Amino acid sequence: MPERFMRGIEVVNGIVWGPMGLGLLFGTGLLLTVRTGGFQLRRWGYWMRHTLGAILTDQSVTAHTAREEQAISQFQSLCTALASTIGTGNLVGVSTAILSGGAGAVFWMWVMALLGMMTSYAENVLGIYYRRKDPAGGWRGGPMYYLRDGLGGKPGRVLAVLFAAFCALASFGIGNLSQLNSIAGNLNAAFGVPEAVTGAVLAAVSAVILLGGLKRVAAVAERLVPAMALLYIVGALTVVGVHITAVPAALAAILKGAFGLRAAGGGIVGYGLSRAITWGFKRGAFSNEAGLGSSVMVHAASNVKEPVQQGMWGIFEVFADTMVVCTLTALVVLTSGFVDLDTGRIAAGAAGSALVGLAFDAVFGTLGSKLIAVCILLFAYSTTLGWSCYGCKAVEYLFGAGAGAGYRVLFVALMPVGAVMRLDLAWTLSDTFNGLMMLPNLIGVIALSGMVVRITQNYLARKLHGSPAPPLLSAGETI
């Protein structure tokens, strides 16, 4: 690859994932938090009752739509979105953030997640409000539509096309080649399964699932995501439970490191305030995908009517991904004894990328690393399913509904390739395209933040105060 091209990619990544891009992401979440009166904090109990509580008590949330309907249930839309957000980054990525930015990075990951909840909320409110019916009776929605129809004019149309193009390209990198490579490498290391066999088997399974369209992907996701999350959460809680006496010290290290109160350990890893903030923000952004706008495309396919209701699912998505799964990974690493909380050094013989597996091995024996390999298989494969939907929606926006079938065939055909090839460039380009997706999306979210506030105030006035005001449900469709 020409050196000039690689330098250009590094420059772009430095912008979109450097102080400028992360500052924009932080600022967007802060703006929305302020303008909605801290909805994710002040209405904590309300959105938890209407998401997690609704899963347990409201059958309409989990009930499948009729076979002939193109829409999916609220629970299916959540699971399909979580399929892509809960990935290998929740394991390896959190370890990397701690080793590169110190325990304090976890605190700033939490901060980014709290603000990201409102970014995800706004994306999904806009996604429902600006979605459109397709000829088959299903919903078409996503950042492309609120950029085109919400912003309007040539700028809106250009930003919509840019978003869709970058999303389609990103789906082949972070959503396919990179994930298959992680799965194949881990299964080979843990069980001796040849990479080529892994690629062929997963391609065959994916062909059956993906060629069935969004409804089939959603049906798989609603079973896979709860199972894989429960498997990892139970395992991680067991590890943390064994080391329960180390939890107070771990939490203290997180708080001290967050504000640069813990000195650097003298090694290659720094624990200064700036590194803690940078790595915490990066991990929070990469993990929950709030700001990318990707998950809006499956949330918009939900059979929900109220934009705010789907917005609350966006809040819960970030909460589950970062505040639950990533936090558990952080505690697994920090209580394991493999990381010195005072110096930040890794214990002799411990590899940074394998810290979670080592922590599980210390509790479960050799079964621990195999359990992590299975978790990586499930996490990475679910990411593939989620991103296949995003890429397909983007391609259909650019080239029409007929292009979706060709996209799925190409997506499946590339899976065996990803399992066996070296993918350093693919990971780099994935970061690039993800960041380039984020920029037009955040421009739209900021520009339309006033509409988000109006829809939110309208909903709360009707639901909490009995206002007779007409509901704000859609910009152009009869609901």
What do these predicted regions represent?
Residues 5, 35-40, 89-94, 172-183, ...:
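Transmembrane helix-loop junctions in multi-pass membrane proteins
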Residues 123-133, 237-253, 261, 265-268, ...:
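Extracellular/periplasmic helix-exit of transmembrane alpha-helices
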Residues 1-84, 88, 98-105, 116, ...:
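N-terminal alpha-helical transmembrane segments of multi-pass membrane transport
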Residues 24-32, 36-49, 163, 180-187, ...:
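Membrane-interface loop-to-helix entry segments
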Residues 59-98, 126-144, 148-150, 165-168, ...:
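Alpha-helical membrane segments and immediately flanking helix-loop junctions
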Residues 38-72, 96-98, 102-105, 110, ...:
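Flexible loop linkers connecting adjacent transmembrane helices
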Residues 68-71, 102-111, 146-149, 154-162, ...:
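Membrane-interface alpha-helices at helix entry/exit sites of multi-pass transporters
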Residues 32-33, 112-137, 148-181, 185-209, ...:
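Helix-loop-helix module between adjacent transmembrane segments
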